[in-house]
Amino acid sequence: EKFNCIRPREYDGSHIQFFGMNPEIALRPHQRNAIAHILYGHNTLLAHVVGAGKTYEMVAAAMEKKRLGLCSKTLVAVPNHLTGQFASEALKLYPNANILVTTQRDFEKTNRKRFCAKIATGNYDIVVIGHSQFEKIPLSDTCSTGTSILMPMQSYTRITAQ
């Protein structure tokens, strides 16, 4: 007989306390669970429908990871037209957060290196950047060729094919 013996892990975020979050905003249970998944699962796809609260999930998870010392700052790449909206929602959820929002001018050729240095050295909680701007940040040879991503996937394919 065949049966499904793989069950996805379920995350419970009901115990998580969010220090510094706007007390007038209450996260819904599915948002708390998604944040727990981000904190404990290390890789997470937020595939909720529009309006389900993905922005709050990302912001709260980023702030909690920083508070716990799991990261020093989070860079969030969003569609270009959503950078301002994302930052606005982030500040609504965490009014005291130090958020850097990129503009088109920041990534003009003459300003790009200086701005990347500002991202690297600044004490920001979250950096919000547009997709087209993110593509202009130079990557190491390993990252740009996809070698670090491709190798584990090849070994995974070999293991499952046997």
Spans of model-derived segments:
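Residues at the beta-strand->loop junction immediately N-terminal to the Walker
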Residues: 47-49, 77
